[in-house]
Amino acid sequence: MKLWGGRFTKETNQLVHNFNASISFDQKFYVQDIRGSIAHVTMLAKQGILNDEEKNKIIDGLNGIRDDIESGSLVIDSTYEDIHSFVEAHLISRIEEIGKKLHTGRSRNDQVALDMKLYTRDEITVLDELLRDLLFELYSLMKEHTETYMPGFTHLQKAQPITLSHHMSAYFEMFRRDRDRLSDIFKRMNTCPLGAGALAGTTYPLDRAYTASLLSFTEPTRNSMDSVSDRDYLIELLSALSTIMMHLSRFSEEIIIWNTNEYRFVEIDDAYSTGSSIMPQKKNPDIAELVRGKTGRVYGALMSLLTTMKGLPLAYNKDMQEDKELTFDAIDTVKGCLSLFTGMIRTMKFNRDTMKASAVLGFTNATDAADYLVNHGVAFRDAHGIIGHLVLTCIEKNCSIEDLSLTELQAISPVFKEDIYDAISLKTCVEKRNTIGGPGVDAMNEVIKECAKYLENNPSIS
């Protein structure tokens, strides 16, 4: 069944039909399509456009179609142009003439705009739950590792001592912002396009506010042309998904590096690793690598939709059909990555001794040694030069700063006293950094309390 054709004298070329059809992918939102149709006919009856008997028969028919699709007794037929024509055709076959009234006061343009918003809204809720699960794992690691010392890095070189708790807190903040972005998008997109028609509304006395309420939207959209041609919310969503993937990719890169024999900071669980077909010793971080690799796929969806929309005049154009596969794939990709990544870090083992030893051997306490001199009256620029010379001496001797005797230290600067060793211990270096946002135990405990409160007060998107 076609939803059009009265003015045509020839059948559609089969290649044209195949090229034009979207049912192979828009069947994904059959639930949302039926939900929107039920709200539409409920409103039509309220407005006296349909009677209650017609409304009830249509709703029963639509519910039956949904139930049959879900049970597998009705298979979505790819010979139809789209999911809208499939549902309407099967409705008419079940309830006959009354089914032809379903589309009264509606265009496929506002119908598909509604379906995409309903689908996207549902998926944002799922994405939010997955992000919250990841945040819980990060929160658990933060609580457990407030005194797990490790080097912090700049330029991928050891810089200053921090804790694993502090490092995980950085990712907690990133993924918290990702949740905030999804929440912002949800609020901005939560307007109902149903009733906008093809582009100029309809002559029927529709109650758009009523259908918006039935479908849990905050209000109807305010302009009918914008309603059917707006894809901003999808671009925003793809941008937010790209940012989530960027954060996952950065984290994956660190896990891949930390998992190497050269670092040995972490060991990925067997359940989240794979082997080699030729090298029996290999245990590869494939999940982290695939998450990193799939980031470009999501970026590509964003750029594709931006490019599709950039030259389109108002209002609807068939180009917009390209939004669906891009969005569906990006959402599914991010959901899969979030789920797997959360499981991977939940089961990952951290090698505390190796991390601590790496911080000691990397001169991460050099800044604190310079601060020691400053606190004893040496100008910072001079202290910087003295400690640089001290580090060079340690490199030549293949030792850490702490390994030098007091005599050796005083040969470089007489300002050094016995208390230097306590001043540059990893514990002291970290504990002195107790300002807001720092790695010190007290500072981190405050952060952990705040994170617990955040997770408790933000159970789901709203």
Swiss-Prot record:
Main subcellular location: cytoplasm
One GO location term (cellular component): cytosol
A Pfam family of this chain: Lyase_1
Pathway stated in the Swiss-Prot or TrEMBL entry: Amino-acid biosynthesis; L-arginine biosynthesis; L-arginine from L-ornithine and carbamoyl phosphate: step 3/3
Keyword Metal-binding in annotation: no
Ion transport recorded as keyword: no
Top-rank EC class of the record's enzyme: lyase
GO MF term list: argininosuccinate lyase activity
Catalytic activity: 2-(N(omega)-L-arginino)succinate = fumarate + L-arginine
Family recorded in the similarity comment: Belongs to the lyase 1 family. Argininosuccinate lyase subfamily.
Name of the molecule in the record: Argininosuccinate lyase
Protein's organism: Lachnoclostridium phytofermentans (strain ATCC 700394 / DSM 18823 / ISDg)
